[in-house]
Amino acid sequence: MNMNIDAEVLIKEAIEARKMAYTPYSHFKVGAALLTADGKIYRGCNIENAGYTPSNCAERTAFFKAVSEGERSFAAIAIVAGPENGDLVLTAPCGVCRQVMMEFCDYETFPIILGISPNDYKIMTLKEILPLGFGPKNLNIEL
């Protein structure tokens, strides 16, 4: 992991983002903090909908906020999750979120910080959580 990335700070930001989650159905709240290459942090939370399909994950919320503001280069993401009235549990991104990361992040090295607390976390790369990922390079496109 890049030494300029402070996992504890990102986890604290993700914990704050989680407080904004809208989860009247699952009561499972997720927060994400996405670090850009130039040091900005974009927060995201999960937002549920009665139809479930239109719901959005915390990770995608953070990415879409950042991309909608012109960001295209990302250094890391921290994710925290757990039941509304319970402890945080180690939770990896869903498949759709992994695919969004594949679009914008370095497949080999992008660090994904899965947090339980600022001092208790696991770091994995995008390649580790999405083996044999399909991305722009599979289409002979260099972004």
Task: Locate predicted features.
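Short, basic/aromatic recognition patches
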Residues: 8-23
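Charged, amphipathic alpha-helical segments
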Residues: 7, 12, 95-99
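Short beta-strand scaffold segments in enzyme catalytic cores
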Residues: 29-35
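Active-site segments that bind and position negatively charged phosphate/pyrophosphate groups
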Residues: 26
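Zn2+-dependent cytidine deaminase-like catalytic core
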Residues: 43-138
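Short beta-strand-to-turn element immediately C-terminal to the catalytic PLP-Schiff-base lysine
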Residues: 35-36, 115
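Feature of Fe-S/electron-transfer and energy-metabolism proteins
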Residues: 1, 5, 9, 120, ...
